[in-house]
Amino acid sequence: MLQSISHVALVVNDPARTAALFEDLFDARRVQRQDDEGHLETFVRLGGVWIALVGAPVQRARTGDHIAFQATPDIIEATVAKLERMGREFIRARSNRALYFFDYDDHVFELNTEDIPAD
């Protein structure tokens, strides 16, 4: 039986810059290490999930694909204020119960206040 998500890997142009975005927005924990083949790996921890930031050239079209984190209304409002100060694009949705924002490589992240029903 599966236990939990180990990590989510995202290909990004600049792992350090993307990690800094999450550090600035959420005080995310950043870990860098070398793998067995000597490649530098960058991870950030968001909402209990490790995000692996894989450095490679990337151009993404915006689709409906996204990673969503549950958050309180206060966290959403604080994130909006930070995104505005940073000049980052974001979209409010569902009567302000959800917030979508984009990293530097157009990956979409959602913060929402709604629970997914158990059944």
Tell what function each PLM region has:
Residues 7-9, 43, 50, 66-68, ...:
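Short aromatic/hydrophobic contact patches that present stacked aromatics
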Residues 2, 9-51:
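Core segments of cupin and vicinal oxygen chelate
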Residues 17, 74-79:
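Short, conserved charged micro-motifs
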Residues 31, 80-81, 85-119:
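Vicinal oxygen chelate
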Residues 1-17, 64-67, 71, 117-119:
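N-terminal beta-strand motif that seeds the catalytic metal site of vicinal oxygen chelate
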